[in-house]
A protein has these predicted regions:
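Glycine-rich phosphate-binding/hydrolytic loop that grips phosphoryl groups
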Residues: 268, 421-425, 528-547
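Short glycine-rich, Thr/Ser-proximal phosphate-binding strand/loop in the N-terminal lobe
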Residues: 296-328, 332, 336, 407-415
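Gly/Thr-rich phosphate-binding beta-strand-loop-beta motif of the actin/hexokinase/Hsp70
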Residues: 287-311, 386-405
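Glycine-rich phosphate-binding loops at beta-strand->alpha-helix junctions
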Residues: 356-357, 493, 497-520, 531-532
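Conserved phosphate-binding/catalytic loops in two-lobed NTP-binding clefts
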Residues: 248-257, 370-371, 518-537
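Glycine-rich phosphate-binding loop plus the immediately following alpha-helix
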Residues: 322-326, 408-443, 447, 541
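Adenine-nucleotide phosphate-binding core of ATP-dependent small-molecule kinases
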Residues: 459-492, 532
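An N-terminal assembly and electron-transfer interface module characteristic of large anaerobic redox
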Residues: 1-293, 311-313, 323, 416-423
Length: 547
């Protein structure tokens, strides 16, 4: 029988367990699905809650301590207690303040835990063993502290899976300071005392972001911070906004549901962040004696290729459908661009790829994220630009850039098709129109129509209903354009975007969306004729050594 007592939170009083000679292990859930959890929980429970229940049920864990740092932990306790399979299930009440009364409250909770453990084990608490574990834990935390340049991971539980994935995407170590990461108690006294231990546990360094107080030690070697949140979690978003307002460090916010994530969107966010802080795993070297450079943007809908000469002038360009495979689509686009320029593959000094297929096309000398490439391409096309709005087939991005085209910050909408080119493409098919026809008709509207749902499937149902009511196609298209513009303007405002605005990507060809977006932002949105080539242009420019 497994006598291990499992736990999750870094506020777990592990030293108390050591005083009872009880082995402990921190759970690090990363289920592939929530099959067990969804059979006994509400669907809106956060991903971490479901992941933890899934882990407990599938591993048949019978001993568990939870800390009631949030409602989800309380609900996990309720579910597991109701099932009646646990031999030991303890919910520790954790104060959110560090006043004297808070320490007293936690001390009483620790004494209650000792009573429960006495009943479970039949053994008395050994304060010397607990004190030894306390001191050992401090030494362990010191060994875990990274003193070389690194990236901090903070916020909600990310686990080994997320930490390793981030480390694979950038050549820097990651310091895990999430709520289940590095545990740094205050120094131990010479003799055990419940009050001193309660105070040390409550006032540990890198305090939980849910606390109403902050105990932070300086981290001068951190070059950037990744703030991780869980879907449906209400806590960490507020802390992230507070940190952003301070503007003291380079921040990236990511969100997962605790299942294994290898999506292109998450990789794009992390890779772009690495490039922003100068830690890209695939740093592009400047080509010498340049004659011709090719940039290839392998997107979800189209693959764009551009060839620049030594003067950074566009020699040829091509836009082709990506088709069934990113690699074959990129090969065709590059071949077409070479043919148009009257060049051969060996005439190119370098090929740089970007887009979601950038790492799989297999024809490049280097690759970079579309965040960096669109920033460089936008600066090339419109040097006055300070905010880049890129709406592609699969996602939409807003990028703030400086006077040199360097990325200052960015946000992405990549969770669904809403507000993207795919959304408009599906609506065009529903209306039996081509995208150019849709662009023209959208400017001829007469009556205001509101598309209330931003979900692609539900919006399609609304469009079908409007068609059934004989609503003019022009008015329906205007409603769709306003819907896309509204979602995009929200991203711009969230990022703090400012004029001058430039729009790139395929949706920039839709005049109705551009007009609605300009109206909502209160400033003209510039659309260059090479808008859809912006990413490929930026990729090629990177080979010139532009940073």
């Amino acid at each position: 029988m497994d006598n291990t007592i499992y736990y999750v939170c870094k506020y777990t009083p592990k030293e108390i367990f050591s005083g009872f000679d009880q082995p402990t292990e921190r759970l690090d859930p990363a289920p592939t699905n929530f099959e067990c959890a969804e059979s006994c929980t509400h669907p809106n429970l956060c991903g971490y809650g479901k992941a933890l229940i899934e882990e407990v049920m599938k591993r048949d864990i019978r001993r568990l301590l939870l800390v009631d740092c949030c409602d989800v932990c309380r609900r996990i306790y309720d579910v597991l207690w109701h099932q009646g399979n646990m031999e030991f299930l303890f919910l520790l009440s954790l104060p959110h303040k560090n006043t004297a009364s808070s320490v007293s409250l936690l001390e009483r909770e620790l004494q209650r835990l000792q009573t429960e453990l006495l009943a479970l084990t039949g053994e008395n608490f050994n304060p010397d063993k607990a004190l030894h574990a306390w001191k050992s834990g401090i030494r362990e935390a010191e060994q875990q502290t990274i003193t070389e340049p690194h990236v901090r991971l903070i916020g909600a539980h990310g686990g080994t899976l997320l930490k390793e994935m981030i480390e694979q995407r950038m050549p820097l170590p990651v310091q895990d300071d999430t709520c289940t990461g590095r545990r740094m108690l205050m120094p131990a006294p010479e003799c055990w005392a419940d009050t001193a231990y309660a105070s040390a546990l409550l006032n540990q360094h890198r305090s939980c972001m849910r606390m109403q107080f902050r105990i932070e030690e300086p981290d001068d070697t951190a070059v950037g911070t990744i703030c991780h949140t869980i879907k449906f979690c209400d806590y960490y978003g507020f802390a992230y906004r507070h940190m952003r307002a301070q503007k003291e460090e380079t921040l990236l916010k990511i969100e997962t549901d605790c299942t294994p994530q290898s999506s292109g969107q998450l990789h794009t966010r992390i890779d772009a962040f690495a490039e922003t802080i100068g830690a890209g795993a695939n740093q592009i070297k400047k080509s010498e004696n340049i004659h011709y450079i090719a940039g290839v943007d392998s997107g979800s809908t189209s693959t764009d290729a551009v060839i620049l000469d030594r003067e950074k002038k566009i020699v040829s360009s091509v836009i082709l459908p990506t088709g069934a495979g990113a690699a074959s689509g990129a090969e065709k686009a590059l071949a077409a661009a070479l043919e148009s320029a009257g060049l051969k593959r060996e005439d190119l000094d370098a090929v740089v790829t970007t887009g979601y297929g950038r790492e799989t096309v297999g024809l490049s000398d280097a690759s970079a994220t579309e965040i960096t490439c669109h920033a460089k391409g936008a600066h090339y096309l419109f040097p006055d630009a300070r905010t880049v709005i890129d709406i592609g087939g699969q996602d939409s991005k807003v990028i703030r850039i400086d006077e040199n085209g360097n990325v200052v910050n960015f946000v992405m909408n990549d969770k669904c098709a809403a507000g993207t080119g795919r959304f408009l493409d599906m609506m065009a098919k529903t209306l039996e129109l081509t995208l150019p026809e849709m662009s023209e008709l959208g400017l001829q509207w007469k009556n205001e129509v509101t598309i209330s749902s931003m979900c692609t499937a539900f919006a399609e149902s609304e469009v079908v209903s409007l068609v059934a009511d004989n609503t003019a196609p022009e008015d329906i298209i205007h409603g769709l354009n306003a819907s896309v513009a509204g979602k995009t303007s929200s991203l711009v405002k969230r990022l703090g975007g400012e004029p001058a605005y430039i729009m790139t990507g395929g949706v920039a060809q839709n005049q109705g969306v551009v007009k609605e977006l300009s109206d909502k932002l209160g400033a003209q949105v510039y659309v260059p004729k090479e808008a859809q080539l912006c990413g490929a242009i930026g990729a090629a420019l990177l080979a010139f050594g532009e940073r």
